[in-house]
């Protein structure tokens, strides 16, 4: 894939709530010129129906070829986006999904690679950090071309929550959630700022915002998925738009800085896991990680989060079905 290619092709694997919402976001924002949607055989007609339904919006947006795809259609795609997986149920953590979704992930990645695909994988199925790692292993692709959605949605939730608390536009809030996309994630308070003004300084001019309120705010961000799942059964709109944003950064070779599941090679004392941190992303995938200088407490949280992910990966890879991939 090159940044000069004019016809941009995306293949979506998984046409559930997240996948179909992502497809709608691509159509609505005019991203890519071709979108193929892959589903399991028993749901193929749903993909056909969604492709038809989405095509009826094109007169209002921009031209795009949309169709129910097969794995061989991945061969010349720029980007394969994986949203397929068992959904998270009420009371279930993202890490509880590992066993079910690793098997699904292996089947998908094996078939995509067999098509001759040589683009970029973008993973959104949960637990996303673990499944980004498994996609890397099962594909044998360079780590730069395997990307997880990471903490992109968590960071957006954090920015929106701070914006509401401080009565400012969320686009003027610059703040990150790092670590696992899940229970061990953490807020990078030390570098949060409003239009370049450090949050601590900004709060000096803001009445009635106490530290306890900020802690509660973060907890609301961390637990947002559970809240939504308990109320409506699933989360999909926020992550769909996050995926569309990542897709645009890749297809347009933006070199945008986004918080993604990025392979760790010693930054923050962490190695051999994919975990959420900011990174520069463009047409060839991850250009480089952006290593925010965390304070000691934040560094410890990053290491603890990575340790949890590593334990899950180590346990999963005891399964003989997945051990062969470790040799890649």
Curated annotation (Swiss-Prot):
It catalyses: (S)-lactate + NAD(+) = pyruvate + NADH + H(+). GO terms for molecular function: L-lactate dehydrogenase activity. InterPro entries: L-lactate/malate_DH, L-lactate_DH, L-lactate_DH_AS, Lactate/malate_DH_C, Lactate/malate_DH_N, Lactate_DH/Glyco_Ohase_4_C, NAD(P)-bd_dom_sf. CDD domains: HicDH_like. It comes from the Bacteria. Its main location: cytoplasm. Its EC number is 1.1.1.27. Keywords: Allosteric enzyme, Cytoplasm, NAD, Oxidoreductase, Phosphoprotein. Substrate binds at residues 88, 94, 126-129, 154-157, 235. It is found in: Cytoplasm. GO terms for biological process: glycolytic process; lactate metabolic process. The active site is at residue 181. GO terms for cellular component: cytoplasm. The modification Phosphotyrosine is found at residue 226. Pathway: Fermentation; pyruvate fermentation to lactate; (S)-lactate from pyruvate: step 1/1. Homotetramer. Belongs to the LDH/MDH superfamily. LDH family. This is L-lactate dehydrogenase. It comes from Streptococcus gordonii (strain Challis / ATCC 35105 / BCRC 15272 / CH1 / DL1 / V288).
């Amino acid at each position: 894939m090159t940044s000069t290619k004019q016809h941009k092709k995306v293949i979506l694997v998984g046409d559930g709530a997240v996948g179909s919402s992502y497809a709608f976001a691509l159509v609505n924002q005019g991203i890519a010129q071709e979108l193929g949607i892959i589903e399991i055989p028993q749901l193929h007609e749903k993909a056909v129906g969604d492709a038809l339904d989405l095509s009826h919006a094109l007169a209002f947006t921009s031209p795009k070829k949309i169709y129910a795809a097969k794995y061989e259609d991945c061969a010349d795609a720029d980007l394969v986006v994986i949203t397929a997986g068992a959904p998270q149920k009420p009371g279930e953590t993202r890490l509880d999904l590992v066993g079910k979704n690793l098997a699904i992930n292996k089947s998908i990645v094996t078939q995509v690679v067999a098509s001759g695909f040589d683009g970029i994988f973008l993973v959104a199925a949960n637990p996303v950090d673990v499944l980004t790692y498994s996609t890397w292993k099962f594909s044998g692709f360079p780590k730069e071309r395997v990307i997880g959605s990471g903490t992109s949605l968590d960071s957006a939730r954090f920015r929106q929550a701070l914006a509401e608390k401080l009565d400012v536009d969320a686009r003027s809030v610059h703040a990150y959630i790092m670590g696992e996309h899940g229970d061990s994630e953490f807020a990078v308070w030390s570098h949060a700022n409003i239009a370049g003004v450090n949050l601590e300084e900004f709060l000096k001019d803001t009445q009635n915002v106490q530290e306890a309120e900020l802690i509660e705010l973060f907890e609301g961000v961390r637990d947002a998925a559970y809240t939504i799942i308990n109320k409506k059964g699933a989360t999909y709109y926020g992550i769909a738009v996050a995926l569309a944003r990542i897709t645009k950064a890749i297809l347009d070779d933006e070199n945008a800085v986004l918080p993604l599941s990025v392979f760790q090679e010693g930054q923050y004392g962490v190695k051999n896991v994919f975990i959420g941190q900011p990174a520069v992303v463009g047409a060839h995938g991850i250009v480089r990680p952006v290593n925010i200088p965390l304070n000691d407490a934040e560094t410890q949280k990053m290491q603890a989060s990575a340790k949890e992910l590593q334990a899950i990966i180590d346990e999963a890879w005891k399964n003989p079905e997945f051990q062969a991939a470790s040799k890649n």
